[in-house]
């Protein structure tokens, strides 16, 4: 009946959001273990392959990490934060699509709104993260790298989290297929690249900027934030 159909569709959407392939039956916990594994392995294999790019990004920027080893300590923090922001944005947008509440705003304005929200979240989290990174890394370079990257990552993650479901919907595909694990993996790769490239740029140019302004590195970094 109608209630069963609604329940089945809701179950499929929830499974898709968690990167789990839905089966014909709704009773997931009574399914055979091999069936359970088969439903999960496809998306997990895709995500593992995508995660290889993160390893390649780190390997390609090994020289930066060798110069400032403590930069590596903040890679999980930045990747996790970006993934969480992207997951929040995608959840809000997918819900808006399912209830039609996003239609009054329009796709471009919805993406722009989420991008601004991501930037604001980045600024707020910088207030918490940058002092800790500066203290823990014992270097203004680490604080600057983490702070600048955090702002860029949260903005990018929120934009991607909103844009991908809208793109899928425009293509006639189920927006729920743009699952949280997929967005998290993508933002992890992009975030690691942004972070290490930012740190690499600062390693080269920060001494020049400090010399040009004639102030200490710590005062320069404090002025930036």
Q: Which residue ranges define each predicted feature?
A:
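Alpha-helical transmembrane segments in multi-pass membrane proteins
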Residues: 43-51, 74-78, 82, 117, ...
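Juxtamembrane helix-loop transition segments at the membrane interface in multi-pass membrane proteins
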Residues: 8-21, 60-69, 85-110, 161-183, ...
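Intrinsically disordered, low-complexity linker/propeptide segments enriched in Ser/Thr/Gly/Pro
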Residues: 210-225
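Alpha-helical transmembrane segments and their lipid-water interface positions
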Residues: 11, 87-90, 121, 125, ...
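Cytosolic regulatory modules rich in charged/polar residues
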Residues: 1-73
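Juxtamembrane boundary at the C-terminal end of a transmembrane helix
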Residues: 196-214
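Soluble-to-membrane junctions at the N-terminal ends of transmembrane alpha-helices
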Residues: 27-46, 104-123, 143-147
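Membrane-water interface of transmembrane alpha-helices in multipass transporters/channels
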Residues: 60-75, 137-148, 178, 209-214
């Amino acid at each position: 009946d109608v209630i069963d159909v609604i329940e089945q569709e809701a179950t499929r959407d929830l499974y898709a959001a968690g990167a789990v392939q839905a089966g014909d039956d709704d009773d997931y916990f009574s399914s055979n273990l091999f069936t359970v594994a088969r439903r999960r392995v496809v998306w997990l294999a895709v995500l593992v392959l995508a995660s290889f790019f993160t390893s390649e990004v780190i390997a390609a920027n090994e020289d930066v990490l060798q110069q400032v080893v403590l930069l590596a300590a903040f890679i999980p923090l930045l990747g996790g934060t970006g993934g969480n922001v992207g997951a929040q944005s995608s959840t809000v947008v997918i819900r808006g699509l399912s209830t039609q509440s996003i239609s009054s705003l329009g796709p471009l304005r919805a993406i722009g709104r989420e991008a601004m929200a991501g930037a604001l979240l980045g600024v707020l989290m910088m207030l918490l993260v940058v002092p800790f990174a500066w203290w823990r890394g014992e270097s203004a370079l680490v604080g600057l790298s983490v702070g600048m990257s955090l702002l860029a990552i949260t903005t990018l993650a929120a934009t991607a989290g909103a844009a991908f479901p809208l793109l899928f919907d425009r293509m006639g595909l189920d927006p729920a297929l743009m699952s949280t694990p997929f967005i998290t993996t993508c933002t992890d790769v992009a975030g690691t690249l942004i972070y290490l490239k930012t740190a690499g740029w600062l390693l080269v140019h920060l001494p020049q900027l400090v010399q040009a302004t004639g102030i200490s590195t710590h005062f320069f970094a404090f002025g930036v934030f």
